[in-house]
Structure formats: structure tokens, C-alpha cells
Amino acid sequence: MFNRNLRAVILKNYNKALTRCLHDAGNLKRPTPPRLPKEQQEEWDRLQKESSKRPVDVMRREKHKDFEGDVNPKTGEIGGPKSEPTVHGDYSYEGRVTDF
């Protein structure tokens, strides 16, 4: 009986201490880089705001083509793919990978 009570007291105190540590860990002030001189800091802040406003439109970028026209100059293939499908070691077309 004494062991059960002792175990309960130890676990209760342990849980309190653990909860306190985890709670306090979120309130720590993290070190930040030193501020720049006023003019440079204003320019830095302005550039940060500008860069966050314009999203990167990756999907609309023009895809790289190895050649122009309908005939592949290396293989003589007519109407085949415009770019090498195994650039990354997989057969992929417009981001979709096939394995056969």
C-alpha cells in the first residue's frame, strides 16, 4: 500500500514538473540577429515585404524543350516528346512519373 501511494506522489510531482518545463519552453526568447543601421534596416524590411507579396508561379513557367519543330534532330523521330523523359532517372511527363 505504501508503494502505491509513493508511486502516485512521485508520478504526480513528475507530471507537474514536466508540464511546467514544457510550458516554459514555449516562452523562451529566441536570439535574433542584430538590427542593421536605420537606412539598411528599412531597405531590408521593404525588400522582405515585397518578396512576400508576389507569389512564385512555378506552374505557369514555360517548360524546357530540347528542340523546336516536329522532328527530333537526334533520333529522327516524328511527333515524339519534345524533351527527354528520363531527365531525373524516371519516365516523367509534366510531373507525372510512369514506371513500366
From Swiss-Prot:
GO biological process entries: mitochondrial respiratory chain complex II assembly
Signal peptide boundaries: none
GO cellular component: mitochondrial matrix; mitochondrion
Region annotated Disordered, chain positions: 24-100
Alphabetized UniProt keyword annotations: Chaperone, Mitochondrion, Transit peptide
UniProt subunit comment: Interacts with sdh1 in its FAD-bound form.
PANTHER family with a match to the protein in the record: SUCCINATE DEHYDROGENASE ASSEMBLY FACTOR 4, MITOCHONDRIAL
Protein name: Succinate dehydrogenase assembly factor 4, mitochondrial
